[in-house]
Amino acid sequence: MLKVDHASVFFAARDGRTVHALDRVSFDIPERGFVVALGASGCGKSTLLNAIAGFLPLSDGRITLDGRAVERPGADRGVVFQKDALLPWKSVADNVALGLKFAGVNRKERQTRALELLRLVGLDEFANAFPYELSGGMRQRVGIARALATNPDILLMDEPFGALDSLTREQMQELLVSVWDKTAKKVFFITHSIEEALFLGTQVLVMSPRPGRVVARFDLDFIRRFAETGDARSIKASPQFAELREEIRAILHSSEDLRSAA
């Protein structure tokens, strides 16, 4: 289980001001949990993900993964960013296997594992291709496969579909549900899309503008319904989905109004 306990982050801005980015954020991600942090730009979502990844120290609070304190990056956390950061001179398979190479895994085993993961994301036919030959959605699929290569306990995903067109984004959401269902990984996912948060999250954390606080939590099962039925259209068209979308939109607007009035 990932546990975030009263996590707060302050940092110094370039002009010398102290910025309060996160304020006492707490939540858990159990086995097979898919937690989505939802909020406007600048609310601390990426700061929170970077702290969980071990890229950024907390000013106060504690983060643990399976009882171990998170203090630095580790192979137990796989990260997928909005920009795929694939190495252009390496093949798709070699990009996926990069973490295994750093871990000292032999080449034959690396290639076998890379092909398994490319098959999982539907790109095994592109193993020998290079990143420039792939579309944006395909490149993000490679990024997901690469993050899974070292068999992490949790996937950390920082708006990975934000730069994609709407149709590709929906396809990637559905692919991610399939990967989550087959691998049983914990996932922490960041987005500013209400619909994406509702569709993917077993729990959605609605965050306030800076300093980022969790102002509402929603426990959901749309992702499980899709994993069972494969019918995204009826899920998103359901009255429950629409009601929750409007409720969350109202919370986000209320938080913005309070900040503007402060």
UniProtKB/Swiss-Prot annotation:
Keyword Nucleotide-binding recorded: yes
GO molecular function ontology, one term from the record: ATP binding
Residues annotated to bind ATP: 39-46
Protein name: Taurine import ATP-binding protein TauB
A matching Pfam family: ABC_tran
Lineage of the species this protein comes from: Bacteria, Pseudomonadati, Pseudomonadota, Alphaproteobacteria, Hyphomicrobiales
ABC transporter domain sequence ranges: 4-234
Database matches in PANTHER family: TAURINE IMPORT ATP-BINDING PROTEIN TAUB, TAURINE IMPORT ATP-BINDING PROTEIN-RELATED
Keyword Metal-binding: no
Chief place where the protein resides: membrane
Its job: Part of the ABC transporter complex TauABC involved in taurine import. Responsible for energy coupling to the transport system.
Reactions performed catalytically: taurine(out) + ATP + H2O = taurine(in) + ADP + phosphate + H(+)
Compartments reported by the entry: Cell inner membrane
GO CC terms, sorted: plasma membrane
Organism (species): Rhizobium etli (strain ATCC 51251 / DSM 11541 / JCM 21823 / NBRC 15573 / CFN 42)
InterPro entries hit by this protein: AAA+_ATPase (IPR003593), ABC_transporter-like_ATP-bd (IPR003439), ABC_transporter-like_CS (IPR017871), ABC_transporter_ATP-bind (IPR050166), P-loop_NTPase (IPR027417)
Quaternary data: The complex is composed of two ATP-binding proteins (TauB), two transmembrane proteins (TauC) and a solute-binding protein (TauA).
Keywords attached to this entry: ATP-binding, Cell inner membrane, Cell membrane, Membrane, Nucleotide-binding, Plasmid, Translocase, Transport
Membrane topology per record: Peripheral membrane protein
Broad enzyme group: translocase
Entry-linked PROSITE patterns: ABC_TRANSPORTER_1, ABC_TRANSPORTER_2, TAUB
